[in-house]
Amino acid sequence: MKQIVALFLFVAGFASGQTSHFPDLEWKEKDLDHFTIRTKSTGTDPARRYSEKTYEVMLEILPGLEGDFEKNEFRTPGGQEAGKEDRFRFTTYLVETDHDFHSCVMIDAKRHNWSNGNVQITKQVGNYLDQMNRYLVICKSDPEQSGGGREKDRKEILVHSLGTALMKSRTHQADLPFWMTAGMGYYAEHKVFDRCSIYYLDFEAYYRQNPDAKVDARKGGTLGPQESWPRILRKLCKGEKRVSLEKTLGAQIVTLSPNESGYIFALNYFMVSTNERTKKYQGFITSIRTGAKPTKDLLLKTMGYGDDASFEKDWYEWMMSSKFK
């Protein structure tokens, strides 16, 4: 099954943090330790089941999340608090129907001056993250089907999006490169489900049009939701089908390939694959939080490398080892 997550660059001024993001809609509410779940005409899963699991995964590599949440040190990219409560809770909105989802989209479109193109794409995809890192909205049925139809399993979208959102919240930034946001979403998926299922392109169509991109024409030769991404990527790396650091950092949705998606995941995983690397990754995030741009030079410097070649040597060796699993 193909699942696609929304990831757009919305350019707008930043309003003050709000506790009630869609006050004109009626919500049922449930608080978890670090999350508030608001539902309309549907249940609290998958948020009730997987939100705290995702938080624990991200807390292991970004311990500063504890202060952001439990001491309410969270700040939007514009520097505002999310609310006046004693602690911050990230909010997940779950709606059943396309009508309610479209209502949320239009409220945010007006609030942040979205373009018509972004509005239409968001309505089609059926999920989006708040650009100020405070909440996530998911339509649990088909957002393009009138009345919604049957609810779908959205747990992968939830975990992927929360992984992205929690990392972004530590940077106090709205505009981060695709390799960081998508890659950390994939990392969270892998840690929670031992697989990656969220696509930013149609993998099946890509492989039909580009059969040489497969590792092997036989079973297990392509990246997909039923395959172990580390196993396939290990084959790619050993087979010299490698994506350079430069190309991985410059990946864009419009030109993305499945292999680039895999290397984006592998890069983020590599950067937190040992305690030493995790501390350096935390330094990278802290630098961005204090205003630095997430450039290749900053990444190499904070991770302790002088050039692309030395970074790639360690990265590829790790990918080809049994430690990448």
Residue ranges and their predicted role:
Residues 15-19:
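Boundary at the C-terminal end of the N-terminal hydrophobic targeting segment
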Residues 22-177, 294-295, 299:
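Juxtacatalytic substrate-recognition/specificity segment
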Residues 3-13:
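Sec-dependent N-terminal signal peptides
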Residues 22-23, 121-135, 153, 172-325:
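Acidic/His/Gly-enriched intrinsically disordered linker/tail segments
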Residues 11-13, 162-163, 303:
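Generic low-complexity, intrinsically disordered sequence content enriched
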